[in-house]
Amino acid sequence: MTQTRKPFIVGIGGTQRPGSSSELALRYCLAAAEKAGAEIDLICGAELELPLFDPGVTHRTPAALRLLQSLRRADGIIIATPSYHGGMSGTIKNAIDYTEDMRGDVRSYFDGRAVGCIVCAAGDQALGATLIGLRSIVHALRGWPTPYAATIKSNEKPFVDGKPARREVAQPLEIVASQVVSFAEMAMASRVDDVAPRLVASN
């Protein structure tokens, strides 16, 4: 039995400022995933302006419900964050914290999902520290960080008119997209094989 639907890839990232480097990086990466055969969903900007996560509060805003609905459906995830003082942005971390609502799911948190990581920052130290932290969070949520991650120097004008200004900006994002889609397809095929009927030879 073979899987027929496209892998569904969710992108989370950016800042409250439209056209930020992390948002543009995420948009380009998702577009590359779509070209690779995926169905995509972008959650960024105002859609990430969620109430501070409180596990004791059961009410969820429409934006939070949309985030959770997409993540539950996702076969792969791409997260793009700026680096603020050596770590990921509070906005992105708060959105990720909402996955606690997925704790009791059959595929809890990010379980069984490939997760691509993108970090934008002005300096190498911030890029490295934030990427390590983001990968650690993905591991804690049972996700599979892709072997390759994209780091972008936001102070070097990496985007022009919303597109990568140079090949060295575009290529890492394309690699992340390719790996997320490829791993998502493999995981989907594995799940299909697990439920496929088995033929047993009779004597």
Q: Residue spans of the language-model regions?
A:
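N-terminal beta1-alpha1 ligand-phosphate binding loop
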Residues: 2-37
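Glycine-rich phosphate/pyrophosphate-binding loop and the adjoining helix
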Residues: 2-10, 144-203
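A general structural signal for well-ordered alpha-helical segments in protein cores
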Residues: 9, 22, 26, 64, ...
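Short, glycine/serine-rich, charged loops/turns that create anion-binding
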Residues: 16-17, 47, 122
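A generic structural motif
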Residues: 36-41, 143
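N-terminal beta-loop-helix "entrance" segment that forms/cooperates
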Residues: 45-62, 158-162
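Helix-loop-strand module that forms the ligand-binding subsite of alpha/beta enzymes
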Residues: 62-141
